[in-house]
């Protein structure tokens, strides 16, 4: 059955799924052979779903990335990590629930896992602050990463946040400073760091745990300097232009792969990760093990040098003179 709540462009799929369920119910309640009709409808639903999700606009991908049933950091950890033990606190009196972390095993290797954590419903989202971490969350994350560095544990981070919390108290506690320290100190880590955007990666809140040797993204995740709504409000003073901003910001995996920002875009199951979370978990685990195996062949200095070079190469631009200007010159 479809996962609820449903997105606007998924409604044609809902009608097909309802028809499929009605036929299944008919088969259970009677001896009528409906195998052929069921196969035809399931095949049609699969084709429709694939067609819809292959043609998603950037604005629609944002809706998928924000889907409340999309697998979260803890969901993925539970899928493929054995013996996970959560670690708490920034040692300054805070234990932010919007950014969680701990140690566990990926296969036969001990690793540190940390990431943003959203809730499934209003109550959970309030407790998790909708995945928007405070300064205490980023300081906790850095404390755990330093712990991993000390014990030579590879670091796996999972990004899923609209941005760092921008409330008055967060600013008073040094939100900008906390993120800046993370950016600085992550470049000095001597262990492999792999970051994965599993939902939405927004602004400095994403970068605070995103300085990595490899940056992965799911197919329908987004990674952006600012939310399209905020961008539209700033540029056009009209949040209704968010779809235009989403297209201009180049927030999709395909765009960011072409720009050299991300290293790999992970395919999602037909309909997105919320339709088949276990399949998404298998895809992510395979990618993490593959990239981790490659990074573990590098020395500590090679890791740091490559990480520095990777980020220094970002943001370069090319100028192309128009023919008209060239003629004038």
From Swiss-Prot:
Pathway in which this enzyme or protein is active: Lipid metabolism; malonyl-CoA biosynthesis; malonyl-CoA from acetyl-CoA: step 1/1
EC number: 2.1.3.15
GO function terms (MF aspect): acetyl-CoA carboxylase activity; ATP binding; carboxyl- or carbamoyltransferase activity
One protein family per Pfam: ACCA
Function field: Component of the acetyl coenzyme A carboxylase (ACC) complex. First, biotin carboxylase catalyzes the carboxylation of biotin on its carrier protein (BCCP) and then the CO(2) group is transferred by the carboxyltransferase to acetyl-CoA to form malonyl-CoA.
HAMAP family for this protein: AcetylCoA_CT_alpha
Name by which UniProt lists this protein: Acetyl-coenzyme A carboxylase carboxyl transferase subunit alpha
Organism annotation: Synechococcus sp. (strain CC9902)
Native organism taxonomy: Bacteria, Bacillati, Cyanobacteriota, Cyanophyceae, Synechococcales
Gene this protein is translated from: accA
């Amino acid at each position: 059955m479809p996962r609820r709540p449903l997105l606007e462009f998924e409604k044609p799929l809902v009608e097909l799924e309802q028809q499929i369920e009605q036929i299944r119910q008919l088969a259970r309640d009677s001896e009528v052979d409906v195998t052929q009709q069921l196969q035809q409808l399931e095949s049609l639903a699969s084709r429709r779903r694939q067609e819809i999700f292959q043609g998603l606009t950037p604005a629609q991908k944002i809706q998928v990335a924000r889907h409340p049933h999309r697998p979260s950091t803890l969901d993925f950890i539970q899928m493929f990590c054995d013996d996970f033990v959560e670690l708490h606190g920034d040692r300054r009196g805070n234990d932010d629930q919007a950014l969680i972390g701990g140690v566990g095993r990926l296969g036969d290797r001990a690793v540190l896992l940390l990431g943003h954590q959203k809730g499934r419903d209003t109550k959970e989202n309030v407790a998790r602050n909708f995945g928007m971490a405070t300064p205490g969350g980023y300081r906790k994350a850095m404390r755990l990463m330093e712990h991993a560095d000390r014990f030579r544990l590879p670091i796996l981070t999972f990004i899923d946040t609209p941005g760092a919390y921008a409330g008055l108290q967060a600013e008073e506690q040094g939100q900008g400073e906390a993120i800046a320290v993370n950016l600085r100190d992550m470049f000095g880590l001597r262990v492999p760091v792999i970051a994965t955007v599993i939902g939405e990666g927004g602004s400095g809140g994403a970068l605070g745990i995103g300085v990595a040797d490899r940056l992965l993204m799911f197919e329908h995740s987004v990674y952006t300097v600012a939310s399209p709504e905020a961008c539209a409000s700033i540029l056009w003073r009209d949040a209704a232009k968010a779809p235009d901003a989403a297209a201009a910001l180049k927030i999709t995996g395909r765009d960011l792969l072409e720009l050299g920002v991300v290293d790999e875009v992970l395919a999602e199951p037909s309909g997105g990760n919320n339709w088949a979370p276990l399949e998404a978990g298998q895809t992510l685990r395979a990618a993490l093990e593959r990239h981790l195996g490659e990074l573990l062949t590098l020395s500590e200095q090679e890791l740091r040098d490559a990480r520095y070079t990777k980020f220094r190469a970002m943001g370069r631009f090319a100028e192309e003179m128009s023919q008209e200007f060239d003629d004038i010159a």
